[in-house]
Amino acid sequence: MKDAKPFPVLKNDNLLRAARGEVVDRVPVWVMRQAGRYLPEFQELRKHHDFFTVCRTPELACEVTMQPLRRFDLDASIIFSDILVIPQALGLTVEMHAGVGPVLPQPIVVPEDLKRLTPDGALSRLSYVGDAITMMRHKLEGRVPLIGFTGAPWTLMGYMIEGGGSKTMSKAKAWLNEHPEDSKLFLNLLTDAIVDYLEMQVKAGAQMLQVFESSAEHLSKEQFLQWCVPYLKRIRDELVDRLTKKAIPVVPMTLFAKGAGHSLKEQSELGYDVIGLDWTVDPLEARNLVGPNITLQGNLDPQDMYRDPDELRNLTTEMVHKFGKSRYIANLGHGITPQTPITSMEVLVEAVHKAL
């Protein structure tokens, strides 16, 4: 895991300062999926390597993580990986199909199928992520902080039951109604694996963590509070407890629950330093709901990246003015999409930095 060589000193810590509510030189900006298909060099690398081969090969994962930093003046890097590495480590096959996305050919269909999962040894099967994080910290040479991440329990459960992405999550939602006790068992099993995984990432050198509850959008507020919030709280509490007991510095944590703008106040009470917002949430309303002691991240509509540069510049500037310079990390309200023009990233990053 973490090698003996000390990590380079961090030169640009605006991301971490913003997360902690400290004064920043400039509003930090990074973009979800900033290492990805909109970059021609990523497409080129993918011609030669399968998606999960890139994830599992630290040198390749680092190369892809570095690609956006060579082009843009970003304030953070995020290790190249995928939320579905946890289902893989738990024994499920995950394949990436062109034009379709992730496919899990043997999904969890009935509660009996939970016996197929292999939590013992799951963490050791994820060691390649830790290796990539440690390698990346050295390759960054202190330029910007490195973010680690995970999928959240409900989101992972959804993929594992649906057998891939879903527009409705109907099978997974049916589980919550028809098998409530087994659903709790499933979510707790995933929570245990996630806490182990995040602890490993911090030990390997991750300087910040993001928890992606991307499928929160399929749940009502009542369901979100029942089936997401207790597990999201447990992730934060148990990780902090473990790191503290081992005298490892606690890194800032971001919760991004897409589509859960209805529960921002509740999210702000879970102990996370940063709350990520999707583009449907008004920045001023969000600030009123979470109060002054939480950092907000977001939330430009990824579709706005297809506008002409002047429009994009104006929208970005307006967004930053709404959030303000304190306790704010600029980002999109979801991942950047594959056909996004490169120039839009240049405009976004420059506009954020010049806005205030």
Curated annotation (Swiss-Prot):
Summary of the function given for this chain in its UniProt record: Catalyzes the decarboxylation of four acetate groups of uroporphyrinogen-III to yield coproporphyrinogen-III.
UniProt keywords, alphabetically: Cytoplasm, Decarboxylase, Heme biosynthesis, Lyase, Porphyrin biosynthesis
HAMAP family: URO_D
Site positions (Transition state stabilizer): 82
Keyword flag Lyase: yes
Protein name: Uroporphyrinogen decarboxylase
Protein species of origin: Drosophila melanogaster
Highest taxon in the source lineage: Eukaryota
Binding site for coproporphyrinogen I: 33, 35, 37, 46, 82, 159, 214, 334
